[in-house]
Amino acid sequence: IGESRDDRIESLETIAALHREYGHIQEVIIQNFAPKPGTAMENFPEPAVEEMMDSVELAARILPGDVAVQVAPNLIDPKSLIAKGVTDLGGISPLTIDWINPEAEWPDVKDLQKKLGDIPLKERLPVYPPYVKKGWYSERIGNLIKRLSDNSGYRKQPGTENAEDSEK
């Protein structure tokens, strides 16, 4: 919100350095500003699409490869951003609104897949697959994660959550 390109570069470089030291950053969300009525910034302009594209490119170039670059698929065409380095489309809910941007409906998963063409969608848990595989989660949710994740750390196909997974 009002950062310059240099500010974004500095922030991304700081995040990258922290991740290289600690290995704990799952994702960086690049989200365009959308002014909201009744707020102090209601009359501020949204950033140009080109600025979002540039921010995604910067993130993809600066961040380590194991840090996901995420955008919300309901705010801007995700296919064009995937071409610039987006690796994650975040959460899409058929049950709830986008609480941050309630004016922007979540896309229907089937419609989104059609838009993306040969780019596959793959459901994951809130804990990213590498962290699932490393066991980087609380013991309190361990059984749930083991029940819901496959051998790759992604979400099991719906309906198979209770199936035995011999490799776990």
Where are these regions (language model features)?
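Short, glycine-rich nucleotide/cofactor-binding loops
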Residues: G2-S4
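Auxiliary Fe-S-binding modules of radical SAM enzymes
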Residues: I9-K168
